[in-house]
């Protein structure tokens, strides 16, 4: 049990172990990296190690505190997310008040602040005051995908750790160690390198189902069948912007990998570099429907969509551009 069960970022694991071993834990830390680097998983594991009743430089996983954290009922670990597109000033004011309350059962009161880059000027300035006047028994772990969107004064008060995506070798070794066959472990390692969050969170069954649904969407879009059904589903999901963007990013990512394989099959039918090898027969059929020029165009369009997601474009615009990429016609009823 412990931090070492997480995939990748061994340098950061060593740093966290050192903090725990020397009992020299910063009161505010900033974990920077893509969601697929599993910053949330590392933050929870580090918080668990701090609160563990039987720790040396890691958590035991079996004490009462560890079990309560796993069940998400531990009173002195709180994970905070923005209410809407940005954090509201009222959220930060409540956090400031809670910051001064003593821990109920834990060694510290720990706040994990997800998407810290989503603080606007008002909420960021309010949070800065919290960091400037920390309570002795409180700790903050901020998570961000983009360091550049945080106030320099907030960054200067945090110990910053920069996370990277696990390497294909780390991912493959991890999954083979769990008894997964080499071919599937290799597939998962490719998906993890493409930024698929489920891989590093070890949600393999969920990922396989998402991949199957992505292939189904690609088939329907290529055949121009059930496009209205896909459009309706995307519009329904877009009612919750954050959840939609999470889903849409994964969909675009998985479609890009499927298109990459079709492109390779155009070049060489027996290519040994196919990622979705278990779908090869279906991808061969899609190759007949999607000429190389169309595949290259779609790969390019998916790259543009990734950029547009980062630019926080309106969800309706993202959906429109996505559908137009495959149908090559205007969709007026988005």
What are these model-predicted stretches?
Residues 1-49, 65-68, 136-138, 146-254, ...:
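Charged, glycine-rich active-site and insertion segments that engage polyanionic ligands
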Residues 2-122:
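Clamp-loader machinery-focused feature within the broader ASCE/P-loop NTPase space
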Residues 79-81, 142, 160-162:
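Structural signal for conserved beta-strand scaffold positions within catalytic alpha/beta enzyme cores
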Residues 97, 129, 156:
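Conserved adenine-binding aromatic site and its adjacent loop/helix in ATP-hydrolyzing domains
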Residues 100, 125-142:
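Conserved catalytic/switch belt of AAA+ P-loop NTPases
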Residues 114-120, 125-132, 148:
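Catalytic acidic motif of RecA-like/P-loop NTPases
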